């Protein structure tokens, strides 16, 4: 079991590392490529577009050919794309590399969740996904710090050499440590309830959890996207203050994420999901009424706590009905989350909504819609249970 957890964590970490590690070098990258920082900020959207593109195909391929091949190819693509970014001499080539980085990270991301669905029952899966969320919260803090330390002595290209090395490590783990987890067969008693036809993506429960997780990701990505403007321009923080604040928010996320598995032993998953949305609603109201930086910071901490306590539980419930189509289900969730959050951020920018109002709007909207869905759509207890996986290969 440890090998699956290790590989799943490594596969997921490529996604946030690809977002956060290069940001500290953005001014130098822009100068060397004769582009403005504003022009290169589109690299974030390009990266997410690459992820969404990979997710369109990775899940189905993983269900048909196995998790391991997709993980290996995704890691190789991420590694090669990182090298392409490091060799870029102009903006379009750099953005092409960023798109391909997203493709590699997206494939690995989908496989990680499919592996956890294959190998864990619902109760343990919710706990592990909460821990995984806590570990990924470390990356937005450590990646910029690591990038800053690297750039003290080396050029910005070294940031992408580091990401390329991460791709190599993940590829080696996938090749030599990861075992195939795709179910080879099901017992006859499970065929009727776990056939591909029975595991339809168009059912009320899956769609409800897809909506909840998409709105939750939209909240956290809106916070990440709006945080520089909100903290440094609106609240007047320095770059150092900004870094400290983001470290504190990540710390809150880690503490809550690592505490959630213990909470699952005491409370029902639905209770934690309601607490999550209650924290989002409280954060939205707090930010809308805030007149001091202290109150605003408190509202931001509530956002991180709300996401951490509920996202893993909701993702576990969303994947629960799927054993034969875990890859497709994971892809669908990933695409919805990436595209939904990007659409909200883009629409808010087009409409000229301020950073604060953008954040307040998604917080209140997410909480109201999600609470209604949690109360109106309960888990279907007849869904397929976790299967013991007959390993197809020991390689």
From Swiss-Prot:
Pfam families: MFS_1 (PF07690). It is a multi-pass membrane protein. It is found in: Cell inner membrane. GO terms for molecular function: transmembrane transporter activity. Keywords: Cell inner membrane, Cell membrane, Membrane, Transmembrane, Transmembrane helix, Transport. Residues 1-3, 63-68, 114-130, 179-216, 268-270, 316-332, 379-395 are cytoplasmic. Signal peptide: none annotated. Residues 25-41, 90-92, 152-157, 238-246, 292-294, 354-357 are periplasmic. Its main location: membrane. It comes from the Bacteria. CDD domains: MFS_MdfA_MDR_like. GO terms for cellular component: plasma membrane. The chain crosses the membrane at residues 4-24, 42-62, 69-89, 93-113, 131-151, 158-178, 217-237, 247-267, 271-291, 295-315, 333-353, 358-378. PANTHER family: MAJOR FACILITATOR SUPERFAMILY MULTIDRUG TRANSPORTER MFSC. Belongs to the major facilitator superfamily. DHA1 family. MdtL (TC 2.A.1.2.22) subfamily. This is Multidrug resistance protein MdtL. It comes from Salmonella paratyphi A (strain ATCC 9150 / SARB42). The gene is mdtL.
